């Protein structure tokens, strides 16, 4: 085969390839590429518009900022609760084993002695100056009313270095057997609760004490019936 015929065959093969590329399959490939390019261009245009008008990007940053601002009051509230929980508080109950005398305990279930509060010689010692809610309840009982009722006294006193003596903060007087006396019936068992509570400005080192004139008539059946406490406000 001559060189000229070989060159002619190559030219014919090249022409055949070009015709195939211009055929239906080649046209489909070109159309597919054109559509893909159009979609990519449209997508890029939409993304640019969203970024330009702040629909995405800056808005998410603003939402993040708003969320942080909303969290600030919650954080401040949590810190406030932590500070409040650091205030002195005490809740004492009567020792059920010391029936006949009023002795307080603060190291058993359902009692509190926190943040500096102390129980010394049956007195509650305050660790700091400020407003305090002071409270106490005593429950008295008797088997028979009899002809004469008992005059029950319940009081909370404060001993401070300024006065060098006990000063009464709260006091209450009750008469036992009131219901039986009103009914004028047969003698029966009686129960009389006496509750005290008040808010006072107290001083660091003040001592609070509960007194009653009939400790032998206190009802020690349940620990929640006789209690004494103070809460810093």
Swiss-Prot record:
<dbReference type="GO" id="GO:0033209">
    <property type="term" value="P:tumor necrosis factor-mediated signaling pathway"/>
</dbReference>
<keyword id="KW-1015">Disulfide bond</keyword>
<comment type="similarity">
    <text>Belongs to the tumor necrosis factor family.</text>
</comment>
<comment type="subunit">
    <text>Homotrimer. Interacts with SPPL2B.</text>
</comment>
<dbReference type="GO" id="GO:0050793">
    <property type="term" value="P:regulation of developmental process"/>
</dbReference>
<dbReference type="GO" id="GO:2001238">
    <property type="term" value="P:positive regulation of extrinsic apoptotic signaling pathway"/>
</dbReference>
<dbReference type="InterPro" id="IPR006053">
    <property type="entry name" value="TNF"/>
</dbReference>
<dbReference type="GO" id="GO:0051092">
    <property type="term" value="P:positive regulation of NF-kappaB transcription factor activity"/>
</dbReference>
<dbReference type="GO" id="GO:0005886">
    <property type="term" value="C:plasma membrane"/>
</dbReference>
<feature type="site" description="Cleavage; by SPPL2A or SPPL2B">
    <location>
        <begin position="34"/>
        <end position="35"/>
    </location>
</feature>
<keyword id="KW-1133">Transmembrane helix</keyword>
<dbReference type="GO" id="GO:0005164">
    <property type="term" value="F:tumor necrosis factor receptor binding"/>
</dbReference>
<keyword id="KW-0449">Lipoprotein</keyword>
<dbReference type="GO" id="GO:0051046">
    <property type="term" value="P:regulation of secretion"/>
</dbReference>
<keyword id="KW-0597">Phosphoprotein</keyword>
<dbReference type="GO" id="GO:0005125">
    <property type="term" value="F:cytokine activity"/>
</dbReference>
<dbReference type="GO" id="GO:0009986">
    <property type="term" value="C:cell surface"/>
</dbReference>
<dbReference type="Pfam" id="PF00229">
    <property type="entry name" value="TNF"/>
</dbReference>
<keyword id="KW-0472">Membrane</keyword>
<dbReference type="GO" id="GO:0005615">
    <property type="term" value="C:extracellular space"/>
</dbReference>
<feature type="topological domain" description="Extracellular">
    <location>
        <begin position="57"/>
        <end position="233"/>
    </location>
</feature>
<dbReference type="InterPro" id="IPR006052">
    <property type="entry name" value="TNF_dom"/>
</dbReference>
<feature type="lipid moiety-binding region" description="N6-myristoyl lysine">
    <location>
        <position position="20"/>
    </location>
</feature>
<keyword id="KW-1003">Cell membrane</keyword>
<dbReference type="GO" id="GO:0051239">
    <property type="term" value="P:regulation of multicellular organismal process"/>
</dbReference>
<dbReference type="GO" id="GO:0065008">
    <property type="term" value="P:regulation of biological quality"/>
</dbReference>
<keyword id="KW-0519">Myristate</keyword>
<dbReference type="GO" id="GO:0008625">
    <property type="term" value="P:extrinsic apoptotic signaling pathway via death domain receptors"/>
</dbReference>
<comment type="function">
    <text>Cytokine that binds to TNFRSF1A/TNFR1 and TNFRSF1B/TNFBR. It is mainly secreted by macrophages and can induce cell death of certain tumor cell lines. It is potent pyrogen causing fever by direct action or by stimulation of interleukin-1 secretion and is implicated in the induction of cachexia, Under certain conditions it can stimulate cell proliferation and induce cell differentiation. Induces insulin resistance in adipocytes via inhibition of insulin-induced IRS1 tyrosine phosphorylation and insulin-induced glucose uptake.</text>
</comment>
<dbReference type="InterPro" id="IPR002959">
    <property type="entry name" value="TNF_alpha"/>
</dbReference>
<feature type="site" description="Cleavage; by SPPL2A or SPPL2B">
    <location>
        <begin position="49"/>
        <end position="50"/>
    </location>
</feature>
<dbReference type="GO" id="GO:0045944">
    <property type="term" value="P:positive regulation of transcription by RNA polymerase II"/>
</dbReference>
<feature type="domain" description="THD">
    <location>
        <begin position="88"/>
        <end position="233"/>
    </location>
</feature>
<keyword id="KW-0202">Cytokine</keyword>
<keyword id="KW-0964">Secreted</keyword>
<comment type="function">
    <text>The TNF intracellular domain (ICD) form induces IL12 production in dendritic cells.</text>
</comment>
<keyword id="KW-0812">Transmembrane</keyword>
<dbReference type="InterPro" id="IPR021184">
    <property type="entry name" value="TNF_CS"/>
</dbReference>
<dbReference type="GO" id="GO:0006955">
    <property type="term" value="P:immune response"/>
</dbReference>
<feature type="site" description="Cleavage; by SPPL2A or SPPL2B">
    <location>
        <begin position="51"/>
        <end position="52"/>
    </location>
</feature>
<protein>
    <recommendedName>
        <fullName>Tumor necrosis factor</fullName>
    </recommendedName>
</protein>
<feature type="transmembrane region" description="Helical; Signal-anchor for type II membrane protein">
    <location>
        <begin position="36"/>
        <end position="56"/>
    </location>
</feature>
């Amino acid at each position: 085969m001559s060189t000229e015929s070989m060159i002619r065959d190559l030219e014919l093969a090249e022409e055949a390839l070009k015709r195939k590329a211009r055929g239906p399959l080649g046209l489909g490939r070109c159309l597919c590429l054109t559509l893909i390019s159009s979609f990519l261009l449209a997508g890029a245009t939409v993304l640019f518009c969203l970024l330009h008008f702040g629909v995405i990007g800056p808005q998410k940053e603003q939402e993040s900022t708003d969320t942080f601002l909303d969290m600030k009051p919650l954080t401040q509230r949590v810190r406030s609760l932590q500070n409040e929980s650091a205030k002195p508080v005490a809740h004492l109950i009567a020792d059920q084993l010391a029936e006949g005398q009023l002795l307080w305990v603060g190291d058993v279930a359902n009692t509190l002695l926190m943040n500096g509060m102390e129980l010394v010689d049956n007195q509650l010692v305050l660790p700091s100056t400020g407003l305090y809610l002071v409270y106490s309840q005593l429950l008295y009982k008797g088997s028979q009313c009899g002809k004469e009722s008992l005059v029950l006294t319940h009081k909370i006193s404060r001993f401070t270095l300024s006065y060098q003596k006990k000063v009464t903060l709260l006091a209450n007087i009750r008469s036992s057997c009131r219901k039986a006396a009103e009914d004028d019936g047969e003698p029966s068992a009686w129960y009389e609760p006496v509750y005290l509570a008040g808010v006072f400005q107290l001083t660091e080192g003040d001592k609070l004490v509960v007194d009653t004139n009939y400790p032998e008539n206190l009802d020690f059946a349940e620990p929640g019936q006789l209690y004494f406490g103070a809460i810093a406000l």
